[in-house]
Structure formats: C-alpha cells, structure tokens
A protein has these predicted regions:
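The feature captures the beta-strand-to-loop junction immediately N-terminal to the Walker
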Residues: 39-41
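Helix-to-loop junction immediately C-terminal to a conserved catalytic motif
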Residues: 54
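Conserved ABC transporter NBD signature motif
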Residues: 62-70, 79
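Conserved ABC ATPase "signature" region
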Residues: 115-133
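Conserved ABC ATPase signature
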Residues: 137-141
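Catalytic Walker B motif of ABC-type/P-loop ATPase nucleotide-binding domains
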Residues: 162-165
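Conserved ABC ATPase "signature" C-loop
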Residues: 215-216
Length: 276
C-alpha cells in the first residue's frame, strides 16, 4: 500500500435540488489496496458519498480527486476506468439482451480488441458462476443472479477501485459468501475495495477500515474493532453490533473482556480462557 491517496476528498459538501444537504465537509484519504466499509443509517450520506467517486455526482463545495484527477473537470467515462461501481439495485445498470452482452458491454465501449473482450468477460462470468447462463436474457435471472451479473460487468473492466453498494442484498448464503470471497481475492490482488453496507457482520469479517457516516458527515474513521468498542458512535448512529461481538460482550460477566468480531477470533478467545 502506498502513501499516495487514490481517493481524496476535501471539504466535500453536496446538496440535492431544493437545498437538501446530503454531505457536509467530508475529508477522506483512501489509499490503494485498502478494504473500506462505509456505514451509517439510511439517509446518512453513504451512497451520496461514493457516487462522487466516479463522477455521478459533482461537489457543491470542496473537491474530490480520483488518482489525482479532479472529478469536477473529468468525464464520468474517464473516471469509470478507475472506479467500478456496482449499484445496490442491479436493474439500474442492466439493459442488454443477454448475460454475455451485459458483461462485455463496458469493454466494447472502451474499444478493447476481441480477444481481450472474450477473455475478460469469460473470467468475470466464471468468477460469479454465470458463465453457463451467458446466453440467457438478464430478465430471466433471479434477483440474486442479476446482482452477480452487475458485479461481473464491473469486474470485467479490471478497475483499480471497486465500489460495492450493499453487495449481498437479495443473495442467499452461498451467493453472499461467493461475492465476499471474490471481494477478498480482488483486495488480495491489490484492488481498493469500498463496501457500503448495513450488515455489520460483513464489516467485522472483511473490512480493515470503517468510515461511519451520520447526517452527511464522516464522524468516525477507524478499524472495525475500534468502531465496535465505541459505544458513543454506536448509540448516536443506531449501528448494531455484529452477532459475534454481542456474544463477546455477554462473556464480560465471566471475566472475558476481549472484543472479538469473527467466529474464529471468538473460538480462539474461549480456548485461551479455558486454558487459564
């Protein structure tokens, strides 16, 4: 990971038409290779924030720089080569007549050669277990499959930054696990992963950094453990503890004070306690 931010915001403020303030004075530096969760209650500004990262929204005040490019003067098409965005609702970005067409559309827009289109589309569809359905119409897919198709269409572009907006919505357990394991693989390969989510179990298990939004402001920027130990932040935002952390808190009455966030951490803590 380098010290140079791939995403930089300074005094980022944004108001929707009608002077509805959605973001206020957000200062962030996100570096290449981070896995960042962006959390907060509905209306806290999470999705509005990440829509500034590929130019879908432009700051009312302040600025956003993506790999050094000021989004106010950079085309969305250029920013989309850096930041891939998978929307919460897959139907907002699916419009082709076959799974293959949808997954390869962005590559064709970039005028990539036929061999590269074939290879990258195939790899992306295999990664989300949709290659066998490549000739099917997207509307014939389940919602979970359409979510995976939307993910594949962005994966095919090989952008250095991947934004996942509620990535496991509508997914069964196996599909949820598959998408998150894919995010982990991309992160391990050096991609920057930003995950907007209400699911604190995902935050606890996968994120290395958490940005907490409240009323358009980033009120906390810390590790998952630090966030889930901060009762003031949890209470003021309505965030819930992940299930394992709840169990760990219940063990405090038995003299086990360690904050654990994942099942493996909890098992290790219990084994250590039993040995003493």
């Amino acid at each position: 990971m380098t010290d140079q931010a791939i995403i930089e915001t300074r005094n980022l403020s944004y108001s929707y038409p009608g002077e509805i303030s959605a973001l206020s004075g957000v200062d962030l530096d996100i570096r290449p290779g981070e896995f960042v969760a962006i959390v907060g209650s509905n209306g806290s500004g999470k999705t509005t924030l990440v829509k500034h990262f590929n130019g879908l929204l432009k700051p009312s005040q302040g600025y956003v720089r993506i790999d050094g490019l000021d989004t106010r003067s950079t085309r969305v098409s250029e920013l989309s080569r850096i930041v891939g965005f998978v929307f919460q609702n897959p139907d907002h970005q699916i419009f082709a007549y076959s799974v293959w067409e949808e997954a390869s559309f962005g590559l064709k827009l970039l005028r990539m050669d036929e061999e590269a289109v074939e290879q990258q589309t195939s790899e992306a569809l295999r990664a989300v277990s949709l290659y066998a359905l490549r000739d099917r119409h997207p509307r014939a897919l389940s919602r979970g499959q359409r979510q995976r198709l939307a993910t594949a269409s962005i994966l095919a572009l090989n952008t250095p930054v991947l934004v996942l907006d509620e990535p496991t919505t509508g997914q069964d357990f196996l599909s949820r696990r598959q998408i998150m394991e894919l995010a982990v693989e991309l992160h391990a390969a050096g991609r920057t992963v930003l995950m907007v989510t209400h699911d604190m179990a995902l935050v606890a298990e996968y994120a290395t950094r958490v940005i907490v939004m409240r009323e358009g402001a980033a009120i906390c920027d810390a590790t998952p453990k630090e966030v889930f130990e901060n009762d003031e932040v949890l209470e003021s935002t309505g965030l819930d503890l992940p299930p394992v952390a709840k169990i760990a808190r219940g063990l405090r009455a038995y003299g086990i004070s360690e904050t654990t966030l994942t099942q493996s951490e909890l098992v290790e803590t219990l084994i250590t306690a039993l040995r003493h």
